[in-house]
Design a protein with these regions (language model features):
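Alpha-helical transmembrane segments of polytopic membrane proteins
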Residues: 50-53, 130-137, 183-195, 212-213, ...
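Alpha-helical membrane-protein architecture signal
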Residues: 2-6, 88, 92-96, 124, ...
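Helix-loop-helix units of permease transmembrane domains in multi-pass membrane transporters
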Residues: 67-97
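Transmembrane helix segments
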Residues: 155-253
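Helix-loop interface residues and adjacent transmembrane-helix termini in multi-pass membrane transporters
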Residues: 84, 151-152, 258
Length: 288
């Protein structure tokens, strides 16, 4: 894994993607810092950091688009698939390389609260916990991009789909009000979701039986719940998706001044899940 990690880190900086990515986020964070903290005198760097989140939606897809898609495009993925290194080590090596690139501006951000302290009052607990939440949020975004990159051989398609997915999560809080609340509407959404889950399972495993069983169980469960206790389906998906408003966890740190340990665990759980899905996608290609 260490060899893959070093190779990936080297490739990011040799191709300038890593340098541009780190410099871009550092400059954007510095601009917000000057405007809000130095010129306006606002004592919380966490407030400035909130403005950088939008830039992650643009920069992360560029960082993650080549993680697997470029290997498939250049056919160099066959070397990885036939190497003695486990798939978990391959995926983790690539993922940790991207996280390392992202960590550079985050480490630089740690200097800004110290500068605020030189000017007056600083709130280290809020600022540094917000930087931690920002870092983990970025790691989730990178994991999303890596997973989507593993599904295609086109880096451009990987970047576009990642950008679309990140914008969806960014706007999800505003979109929830448009989700239907009736039981029948949520049942239809339930059926569509399990159909997509079945397709995803088949895409990963190429096993029609497993995909069919999972889809069938989902259909039956949804229909049974609808006829037995349909109130459970009312506003079901708007409630569930409300827990996937990833930016709200960060805002708990930066704006509500709450150390949201459960939110950090949510970030870590999503990272583990997406890494696992990427490994399974790679596993399917090894045997196909």
């Amino acid at each position: 894994m260490l060899a893959i990690y070093k190779r990936e880190v080297r490739s990011y900086f040799n191709s300038m993607i890593g340098c541009v990515f780190a410099a871009f986020l550092t400059i954007i964070g510095g601009v917000y810092f000057m405007v809000y903290n130095l010129y306006s005198g606002y004592p919380f760097f966490a407030y400035s950091l909130a403005g950088v989140i939008f830039m992650l939606l643009i920069s992360v897809p560029i960082l993650s688009m080549k993680s697997f898609a470029e290997d498939r495009k250049n056919k160099t993925d066959q070397l990885l698939l036939t190497s003695p290194v486990s798939l978990v080590e391959i995926v983790l090596g690539k993922y940790l390389a991207m996280v390392t690139v992202f960590a550079i501006p985050c480490v630089i951000y740690c200097i800004f609260p110290l500068i605020i302290k030189l000017q007056g009052t600083a709130h280290f607990l809020v600022d540094y916990s917000s930087i931690l939440a920002f870092f983990l949020l970025g790691c989730v975004f990178i994991a999303i991009g890596m997973f989507l990159s593993s599904l295609t051989e086109s880096p451009v398609i990987a970047a576009i789909t990642t950008c679309a997915a990140l914008f969806f999560f960014y706007l999800l809080d505003n979109l929830l009000q448009y989700f239907p609340s009736s039981a029948i509407s949520n049942l239809v959404i339930w059926i569509i979701i399990f159909a997509l889950i079945g397709l995803l399972i088949y895409h990963i495993t190429k096993n029609q039986m497993i995909a069919g069983i999972v889809t069938g169980i989902g259909y039956i469960a949804g229909i049974v719940v609808y006829f037995v206790k349909k109130t459970l389906l009312e506003s079901l998906f708007s409630t569930l998706l409300g827990h996937l408003v990833l930016t709200d966890i960060f805002y708990n740190f930066s704006q509500n001044y709450i150390f949201d340990l459960g939110g950090l665990l949510t970030y870590l759980s999503l990272i583990i899940l997406l890494v696992f899905l990427t490994v399974q996608t790679f596993e399917k290609r090894r045997w196909s």
